[in-house]
């Protein structure tokens, strides 16, 4: 489980000192209590066993670095050394000129020291210090140790308000003062510089330091140096030189290191309040500060990988670049050992070079070129926010004080935690490293130039791969998961407390501290403005004329009485208005009810009118359809439609049935019988229509077996009007009966024509009937030919057609007359009604006029 900075996403490592903090501490509401307890945690002494272990490991690292630096210097050719010296002299020439012109002596409370010239500093070996200056440094070191011992034994005093801004970093990063904060610091004022900081930026390669080292190095700023006065700056330089001398004496060799860490540098300020300011700092002296760059001679750097080692759970040192002098390739000296107190610019002058906002400058490590770093495992964009391994504080689990993970409000048991650890073991093998083992070095040493030897790089890569394989084979302890979870939960709680996402790297910590200082300065300005305004108000007039106040009071009392009277009047008016509003509301309610009833009646009548209109439209449509149907019925006649009389050549037809026969066109008797039956039915229907009764004969319509009965003979005789094709003796008698029946039918037609002529004298038939002759043709079948008989039957049907036409015409005339008679009756009735209505209206008008006259 990797840790990343929440601003720049730089990879970080967890420090064991953070796990000593009780997370319930941050649940307190009083911030002062939190600060006091964190200060107590920061002053815990380091065990002696751990100190010895750290010293041994640092000595081993130094020996390895010296061997690698010597090998690299021996391999490097003199030609490349000369080229690099020329290159660096060209790069840093301007800075040397600036420092030669601006080099001054820092002000110290002791006797001032002389500033060496730039020519003396350009030599590969540092110049010897004067005896007076060495005695002065020893005295300062002794006072520094006494003060640090005093602060380590005495309890911490409550921090005053003025110093809380300076201790903001110390408040939220208590692990910077714990036992795992630096490489071999003994919290007693003595600084052990025998080892090289594992995460020093000036080590030559860009490594990921532990959180404690980032926090310690970030606390060193010009503000913290200047707060202690000139004494603290001189003590700092003296400590650096003394520590370097002690390291050289112990190892009897020249140490190639570009990083010197000083821990728990305690300085007592010269202010009137004589407040004790404890500033725990880790100063990283590299080639970033312009004053130090001017004093360091031209050197060529060769990258030498160092074997990673674990020092108390902290991050091992990445491959550090050893600096070799251009004059000699075998002897490698540290640039920090050649720095004298006079080479460090005074805090007052450094503060003059700050930004317009007067933000304190910090001695920051060198900004490495990221393009020169290539990872053997996988490339990482360390300063971009597009990293897929960004850490979200909201997703971190909460870890209890006993090490159990709190899931959904309850702590998981031991078995569950072990199962969880086994479940996530694959993930931990790939993403996290055990706290007890040395972590994998993810970045190779930084190549200072293109002339470095490639063999050293290959050896360092092989060593790194072997170390990675060994570390991957080591079993990850179950405690590591809970340690990481506990640390992450601590970051989460601290994030909720200070409203800043944690953890943060060194640069981001400095930025956040600067932001907090800006906010504090703004708030201080506001406080000063408010305090000045308050003082101005307090210094104002406290005594005024009582007479004027009395007059104003009387005027105000009078105005108050007037306003009270106005308020009483307004209350009375308000009551009256409320009564009026109640009355008006009652009237509005009654009017609304009347309006509702009116509109309901209106809607009902409106609906009725629409319904009546619909009914009227329906009745008019029905009347129109009935009239049209009536007209069509008037134009039709039952007899005319039922009996269609026409002709077919020489044959007369009734309903397309031929009546008669010819030699050339023989007709069957079935057709002739059916035609005679229709003729008998037509004549009988016309007689009944005209309400006429024949005198001698009675027509009996019976389809194909119709006949004519004679009534004046007793018993009555029946004459058949149908025949057959049978040839027998009885056929002779049949001809006689058939001929008599046809003669009787002609006689009936003649009687009906005479009856019609009585009603309508103008009526006449085209063919006259005289006994058995019609139109001069004999109708008998016996003793005549077929042509004559067929023609006589055609004349008979023609007379029937004329009679039918007259009946239809007469019937329409009678109907029309009846309609006119009924219409005239209706008109007469309407006229009578109108006359009566007019009379009634006149009478009513007269009565009304009389009533009006009386009134």
From Swiss-Prot:
* Membrane topology, from the record: Peripheral membrane protein
Q: Which GO terms describe its cellular component?
A: endosome membrane; phagophore assembly site; phosphatidylinositol 3-kinase complex, class III, type I; phosphatidylinositol 3-kinase complex, class III, type II
- The segment annotated Disordered runs over 92-212, 236-271, 294-380, 407-475, 826-855
Family, per the entry?
A: Belongs to the beclin family.
Q: Compositional bias of type Low complexity: which residue ranges?
A: 99-123, 131-143, 177-200, 294-348, 446-474
GO MF terms on file?
phosphatidylinositol 3-kinase binding; protein-macromolecule adaptor activity
Query: Where located?
Result: Endosome membrane
Q: Which UniProt keywords apply?
A: Autophagy, Coiled coil, Endosome, Membrane, Protein transport, Transport
Coarse class of the primary localization is membrane
Coiled-coil regions listed: 538-595
Polar residues compositional bias: what residue ranges? 144-156, 368-377, 413-445
Gene Ontology terms describing biological process = autophagosome assembly; cellular response to nitrogen starvation; late endosome to vacuole transport; mitophagy; protein transport
The free-text function statement in the UniProt record for this protein reads: Involved in autophagy. May be required to recruit the atg8-phosphatidylinositol conjugate and the atg12-atg5 conjugate to the pre-autophagosomal structure.
Q: Does the keyword Metal-binding apply?
A: no
| Name of the protein this chain belongs to | Beclin-1-like protein B
Species assigned in the record: Dictyostelium discoideum (Social amoeba)
């Amino acid at each position: 489980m990797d840790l990343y900075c929440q601003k720049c996403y730089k990879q970080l490592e967890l420090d064991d000192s953070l796990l000593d903090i009780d997370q319930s501490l941050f649940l307190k509401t009083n911030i002062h209590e939190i600060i006091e307890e964190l200060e107590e945690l920061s002053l815990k002494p380091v065990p002696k066993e751990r100190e010895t272990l750290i010293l041994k490991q640092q000595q081993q690292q130094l020996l390895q670095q010296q061997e690698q630096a010597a090998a690299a210097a021996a391999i490097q050719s003199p030609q490349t050394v000369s080229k690099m010296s020329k290159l660096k002299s060209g790069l840093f020439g301007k800075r040397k000129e600036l420092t030669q012109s601006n080099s001054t002596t820092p002000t110290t409370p002791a006797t001032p020291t002389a500033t060496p010239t730039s020519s003396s500093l350009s030599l590969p070996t540092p110049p010897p210090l004067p005896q007076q200056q060495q005695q002065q440094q020893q005295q300062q070191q002794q006072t520094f140790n006494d003060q640090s011992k005093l602060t380590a034994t005495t309890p911490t005093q409550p921090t005053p308000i003025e110093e809380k801004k300076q201790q903001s970093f110390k408040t939220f990063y208590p692990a910077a003062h714990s036992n795992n904060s630096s490489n071999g610091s003994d919290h007693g004022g003595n600084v052990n510089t025998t080892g090289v900081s594992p995460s020093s930026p000036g080590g030559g390669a860009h490594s990921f330091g532990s959180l404690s080292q980032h926090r310690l190095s970030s606390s060193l700023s010009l503000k913290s140096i200047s707060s202690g006065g000139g004494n603290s700056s001189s003590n700092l330089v003296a400590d650096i030189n003394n520590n370097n001398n002690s390291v050289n004496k112990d190892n009897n060799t020249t140490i190639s290191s570009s990083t010197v860490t000083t821990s728990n540098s305690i300085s007592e300020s010269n202010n009137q309040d004589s407040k004790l300011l404890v500033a725990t700092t880790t100063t990283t002296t590299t080639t970033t500060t312009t004053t130090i760059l001017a004093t360091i001679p031209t050197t060529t750097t060769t990258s030498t990988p160092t074997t990673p080692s674990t020092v108390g759970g902290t991050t091992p040192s990445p491959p550090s670049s050893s600096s070799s002098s251009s004059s000699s390739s075998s002897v490698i000296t540290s640039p920090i050992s050649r720095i004298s107190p006079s080479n460090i610019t005074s805090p007052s002058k450094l503060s003059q070079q700050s930004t317009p906002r007067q933000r304190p400058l910090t001695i920051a490590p060198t900004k490495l070129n990221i393009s020169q770093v290539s990872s053997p495992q996988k490339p990482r964009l360390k300063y971009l926010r597009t990293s897929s391994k960004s850490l979200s504080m909201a997703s971190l689990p909460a870890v209890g004080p006993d090490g159990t993970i709190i899931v959904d409000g309850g702590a998981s048991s031991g078995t569950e935690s072990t199962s969880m650890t086994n479940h996530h073991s694959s993930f931990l093998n790939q993403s996290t490293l055990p706290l007890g083992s040395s972590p994998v070095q993810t970045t190779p040493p930084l190549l200072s130039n293109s002339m470095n030897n490639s063999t050293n790089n290959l050896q360092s890569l092989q060593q790194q791969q072997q170390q990675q394989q060994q570390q991957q084979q080591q079993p990850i302890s179950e405690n590591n998961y809970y340690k990481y979870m506990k640390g992450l939960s601590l970051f989460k709680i601290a994030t909720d407390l200070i409203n800043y996402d944690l953890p943060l790297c060194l640069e981001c910590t400095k930025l956040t501290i600067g932001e907090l200082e800006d906010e504090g300065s703004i708030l201080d300005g506001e406080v000063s403005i408010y305090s000045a305004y308050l003082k101005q108000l307090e210094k104002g007039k406290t005594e005024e004329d009582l007479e004027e106040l009395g007059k104003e009071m009387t005027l105000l009392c009078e105005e108050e009485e007037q306003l009270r009277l106005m308020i009483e009047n307004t209350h009375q008016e308000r009551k009256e208005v409320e009564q009026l509003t109640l009355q008006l509301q009652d009237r509005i309610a009654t009017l609304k009810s009347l309006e509702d009833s009116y509109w309901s009646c209106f809607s009902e009548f409106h609906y009725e009118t629409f319904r009546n209109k619909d009914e009227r439209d329906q009745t008019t449509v029905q009347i129109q359809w009935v009239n049209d149907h009536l007209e069509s019925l008037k134009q039709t006649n039952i007899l005319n439609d039922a009996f269609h009389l026409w002709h077919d050549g020489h044959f007369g037809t009734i309903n397309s049935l031929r009546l008669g026969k010819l030699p050339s066109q023989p007709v069957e008797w079935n057709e002739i019988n059916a035609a005679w039956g229709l003729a008998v039915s037509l004549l009988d229907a016309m007689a009944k229509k005209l309400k006429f009764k024949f005198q001698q004969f009675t027509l009996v319509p019976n389809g194909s077996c119709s006949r004519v009965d004679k009534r004046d003979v007793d018993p009555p005789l029946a004459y058949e009007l149908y025949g057959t094709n049978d040839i027998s003796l009885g056929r002779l008698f049949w001809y006689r009966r058939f001929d008599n029946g046809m003669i009787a039918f002609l006689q009936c037609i003649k009687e009906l024509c005479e009856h019609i002529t009585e009603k309508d004298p103008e009526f006449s038939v085209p063919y006259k009937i005289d006994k058995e002759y019609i139109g001069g043709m004999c109708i008998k079948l016996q003793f005549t030919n077929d042509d004559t008989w067929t023609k006589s039957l055609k004349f008979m049907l023609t007379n029937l057609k004329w009679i039918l036409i007259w009946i239809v015409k007469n019937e329409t005339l009678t109907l029309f007359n009846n309609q006119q008679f009924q219409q005239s009756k209706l008109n007469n009735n309407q006229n009578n009604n109108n006359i009566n209505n007019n009379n009634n209206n006149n009478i009513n008008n007269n009565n009304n006029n009389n009533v009006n006259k009386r009134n």
